[in-house]
Amino acid sequence: MIIRYYKPYTSGTRKRSVSNFSEITKSNPEKYLTFFVHRSKGRNSRGVITCRTLGGGHKRLYRRIEFKRNKLGILGKVISIEYDPNRNARIALIYYKNGDKSYIIHPFDLCVGNNIISDFFSPIKIGNSLPISKIPLGTIIHNVEFEPGKGGQIARAAGTFVQILANEGKFVTITMPSGEVRLLRRYCWATIGQVGNLDHSNVVLGKAGRNRWLGNKPTVRGVAMNPCDHPHGGGEGRSPIGRPKPVTPWGKPALGKKTRSPKRFSNKYIIRSRKMV
């Protein structure tokens, strides 16, 4: 991925940067692998706003991504690498020997023409999928399952990866993208390699309108509102919030309040918290 930087001819192009999409090999998606999804725009089923910072944005077709690599033992070939407006990673179109086609998350260094396979004893090669208990220690993986058979849920964003640290008994120790060290069941599946589009974090939007294209609305601070709109609002000039601790618009503690339950069943699987990194 190559990033193109704009010259500061206007305030909208100053510090603006975009990807040049050099890795994209096909512009139009497979028609039968896409469908339209009605976007909630931050509202619930009654039309009431439940998330004030979502809404608008360009229309999108959702691509069916194969997070659960269940075509066991069937060789697949990479036909194209495509842009997906629903995620920051690229997607790869795979053609299988049985005639099926599907999309997968595009790993870094997977090229058009490469072959991939999903099996219990797949070779350790980028794009191949197998149980994490069969993967050597230190290997970088992505699209990792939390629960066996549920499909990949961990490390699906651009540039993310998981690393295997230990393999003992019923569990495998991994390092999460956040730095958290935790245990996973040995029967969970994963895909070899790191998610592509590594430089996505270096892209600068440059103007507010570009954020609106993505469906994000402005986030207004509570202290900038009136007292009828937020507990932090009101006052003369630049005044403090007038409370011992910050709260949400509905008066509940915010900014530092712990939200994870100390009795959560999965706490026993966390060896080192991400906050200790």
Curated annotation (Swiss-Prot):
> Sorted alphabetically, which InterPro entries does this protein's record hold?
NA-bd_OB-fold, Rib_uL2_dom2, Ribosomal_uL2, Ribosomal_uL2_bac/org-type, Ribosomal_uL2_C, Ribosomal_uL2_CS, Ribosomal_uL2_dom3, Ribosomal_uL2_RNA-bd_dom
Q: Which domain of life is it from?
A: Eukaryota
Against SMART domains, the record matches this protein to: Ribosomal_L2 (SM01383), Ribosomal_L2_C (SM01382)
Q: Which UniProt keywords apply?
A: Chloroplast, Plastid, Ribonucleoprotein, Ribosomal protein
Where is this chain compositionally biased, Basic residues type?
255-277
Record keyword Chloroplast present:
yes
Quote the SUPFAM superfamilies the UniProt record gives: Nucleic acid-binding proteins (SSF50249), Translation proteins SH3-like domain (SSF50104)
Alphabetical GO biological process terms: mitochondrial translation
What subcellular compartments does it reside in?
Plastid, Chloroplast
Name the major location.
plastid
Coiled-coil segments: none
For the region Disordered, what residue ranges are annotated? 225-277
What GO molecular-function term can you cite, just one? structural constituent of ribosome
User: What Gene Ontology terms describe where this protein resides (cellular component)?
Assistant: chloroplast; mitochondrial large ribosomal subunit
Q: How does it assemble?
A: Part of the 50S ribosomal subunit.
Instruction: Report the NCBIfam families cross-referenced here.
Output: rplB_bact (TIGR01171)
Q: Which PANTHER family match?
A: LARGE RIBOSOMAL SUBUNIT PROTEIN UL2M, RIBOSOMAL PROTEIN L2
Q: Which family is this sequence assigned to?
A: Belongs to the universal ribosomal protein uL2 family.
Protein name, as recorded? Large ribosomal subunit protein uL2c
